Amino acid sequence: MEAAKESQLFSARSSISTRRLLTGGRLWDLLAALVIGFAVWKIFIAPRSFEAAGTHPAPAAIYQRLHGEAFRVADGRGRVLFLDFYASWCEPCKLELPLVEAWSRAHPDAAVVPIDVGEGRSVAATFARRYKLQNVALDPNGSARPLFAVEGFPTIVVIDRNGFIRAKWEGLNPAIALAMDNALSSFER
């Protein structure tokens, strides 16, 4: 009789802990599904969402390049222009900038301009050398933040051949080359 009671007690405790484990396991499954869903959205869906043509004209911003000459956003007309806003202290920028630079070298028909925001020339120059960045423009006063609605780094703004902002991608995207390919093929016509 005593053994039967102990067996029932053990069975009840085991059942309770199994339910807790399954509930906790289900919670982790749900969390994993949400993370995977966000990653799919960030990498494959969001970069394919473009604003309607002619909605937002690009601001007539002018920045100095690292080597002294002026860069005018309006000079990008006739080509798809990617403005890559970053800061040297931004860890995700350090991961994404080399991907963007590699894509830029492979696609000379597009214009890619990395823009260092909020930092002086010497800091920007050191960072550009370290990461082998080309055509770097400077925005030491941070005017890009209100002009292009840059809220965080990295941020890439895509401007079509007619000078209209068609997309803005914020945050690290490991598949940024895929997003840039899609934008170039959509807007170079």
Per-range role (PLM):
Residues 60-81:
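A short beta-strand-turn-helix
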Residues 1-62, 178-181:
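N-terminal targeting signals for export/organelle localization
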Residues 94-131, 140-146:
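Structural microenvironment flanking redox-active thiols in thiol-disulfide oxidoreductases
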Residues 79-81, 85-89, 152:
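Short pre-active-site segment immediately N-terminal to redox-active cysteine/selenocysteine motifs
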Residues 82-83, 112, 156:
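Hydrophobic beta-strand anchors of alpha/beta hydrolase catalytic cores
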Residues 84, 114-116, 167:
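Soluble periplasmic/extracytoplasmic beta-strand elements of cell-envelope proteins
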Residues 77-79, 109, 133, 150:
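Active-site acidic short loop of glycosyltransferases
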Residues 128-133, 139-187:
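Thiol/disulfide oxidoreductase modules built on the thioredoxin-like
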